[in-house]
Each structure stands twice: as C-alpha cells, then as structure tokens.
UniProtKB/Swiss-Prot annotation:
InterPro entries: L24e/L24_sf (IPR038630), Ribosomal_eL24 (IPR056366), Ribosomal_eL24-rel_arc (IPR055345), Ribosomal_eL24-rel_N (IPR000988), Ribosomal_eL24_CS (IPR023442), TRASH_dom (IPR011017). Signal peptide: none annotated. One of its GO terms (biological process) is translation. The lineage of its organism: Archaea, Thermoproteota, Thermoprotei, Sulfolobales, Sulfolobaceae. A zinc finger (C4-type) spans 7-37. GO terms for cellular component: ribonucleoprotein complex; ribosome. It comes from Sulfolobus acidocaldarius (strain ATCC 33909 / DSM 639 / JCM 8929 / NBRC 15157 / NCIMB 11770). Zn(2+) binds at C7, C10, C33, C37. One of its GO terms (molecular function) is zinc ion binding. Belongs to the eukaryotic ribosomal protein eL24 family. Part of the 50S ribosomal subunit. Forms a cluster with proteins L3 and L14. Its cofactor is Zn(2+). Keywords: Metal-binding, Ribonucleoprotein, Ribosomal protein, RNA-binding, rRNA-binding, Zinc, Zinc-finger. This is Large ribosomal subunit protein eL24.
C-alpha cells in the first residue's frame, strides 16, 4: 500500500505522484503540496500558525 505524505507547511495530505520533495543541506526532507506552501515557508518565511488556511492555525486557535 502506498503511503500518503503530509505537507510540511499547511498539513494537508499529499497523494502519491503529486507534491514536491525539498531536501535541505543537512539532509532533512520537506514535503509540499503546492508552490504556494513552498514559497510561503522557504522564500517568505511565513508562520503557518498565523494563516487561516493551514491546519496549524486551526489547532492554535480555540
């Protein structure tokens, strides 16, 4: 059975054959469901807890 991944930024499930795997210089893997998530994390350094469309925002707010 093929396992699904979870987006490192928004927490959304990524289906097999989709998404983007980013490898940092230290060897750690980051999985992204879209370029929106990739750019928000790596280029713009946004905090996912402050964005309403992420799952971590829903977990941080009561």
């Amino acid at each position: 059975m093929v396992s699904t991944r979870q987006c490192s930024f928004c927490g959304k499930d990524i289906l097999p054959g989709t998404g983007l795997m980013y490898v940092r210089n230290d060897g750690s893997l980051l999985w992204f469901c879209s370029s929106k998530c990739r750019k928000s994390m790596l280029k713009l350094h946004r905090d996912p807890k402050k964005l309403k469309w992420t799952k971590s925002y829903l977990g941080a707010k009561p």
